[in-house]
Amino acid sequence: YDLNSFEYEKFSSQFEFTETSDQIKTINQIREDLYSGQPMDRLVCGDVGFGKTEIAMRASFMCLSAGYQVVMICPKVLLVNQHFKTFSERFNKFNYRISKISRFESNNEKKKIKEELTKGKINLLISTHAIFANDVKFQKLGLIIIDEEQSFGVEQKEKLKRFKPSCHVLTLTATPIPRTLQSSIFKIKDISLIQTPPVN
């Protein structure tokens, strides 16, 4: 991974809150994972509002600036729209294209998005599991972010696997760990706990 450190620092400095110690630790762990030469398989576990989305955005930026595409898969349309808004606002000063797919986009819109993903014109896609039904192909996928994996059905988890072989995978969950680990199809090796509440 060839990270543009200057751009990354610029991106990080736009975070309007103070990072918690757990956030900093997790971001550093992800950075090490991405440079290790092995596909990352990390679970980030923390309560709602503890800053998992910012961690996902930093990981995305690292991959995007290295020339890879990113996909974030969410269980609900509401989450897709929420993440799309947050990511779009956070990335608006940088030259990356972000799109979304859920059941509310028209077939024509989906077709156009699929074509642009294949050509590498879209850098980051946020989608529900509709992505599996839409035969989406990426030009250069580097990172899969899975939001609340335990909300996906068995069939959807099986389909997730085919995206996975050489990609980095970051799974976010607010569910306490034991249940998540039992239900995890990915046999996750590395776990980051976000236990520090936000500073403000």
Q: Language model features by range: what are they?
A:
Residues 1-71:
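Pre-Walker A segment
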Residues 81, 138-200:
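Post-DEXD/H (motif II) to motif III coupling segment of the RecA-like Helicase ATP-binding lobe
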Residues 69-76, 101:
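Conserved RecA-like ASCE P-loop NTPase motor core of nucleic-acid helicases/translocases
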Residues 38, 67-68, 95, 120, ...:
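Glycine-centered short loops/turns at secondary-structure junctions
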Residues 78-116:
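Conserved helix-turn-beta segment of the N-terminal RecA-like "Helicase ATP-binding" lobe
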Residues 45, 126-127, 145-146:
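Hydrophobic residues in beta-strands of the RecA-like P-loop NTPase core, especially within AAA+ ATPase
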Residues 104-125, 132-141:
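Conserved motor-coupling elements within RecA-like helicase/translocase cores
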Residues 70, 98, 124, 143, ...:
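Hydrophobic/aliphatic anchor position in the core parallel beta-sheet
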